[in-house]
């Protein structure tokens, strides 16, 4: 068994988790926009959420900013790091050397499944910053999916310049852990 966050996985499953695989899965989304229309009730206006994906957001979504002891990740432009992950210049072994690697495993797992999470979303929530006081996340909406005994969360924020949404954070929690969406308004 192996513990990341507080989700316990078997070693066999952890060994399958790969930053390159997550990057390749994420890259597939570059040619797509996910559009959702949500309505709270019949007295409110519908809200359109259109999500776009690009290289620059992968870095934070994957948690690479947490790997403070991997110098190349800290120095290089985010887009360049993404390209080097894709072309194999930066291997999974490089990232696995980090003291903080275990802290990003749930993010990598979430990104590997992001397309399925968005296709099979369970619920969309309006993000309420006061619902999770210990969190520093700044987002507009939470997209939640539950599968295989795990809860996947993908948080999005609206871009001020073009009104499209982008990924702000993603992570996974076990069914026996507190649901991150408690205190947020569901649609």
PLM regions: where:
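Conserved binding-pocket/active-site segment within a compact domain
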Residues: 110-187
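An acidic, glycine-rich, mixed-charge low-complexity segment common to nucleic-acid enzymes
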Residues: 1-144
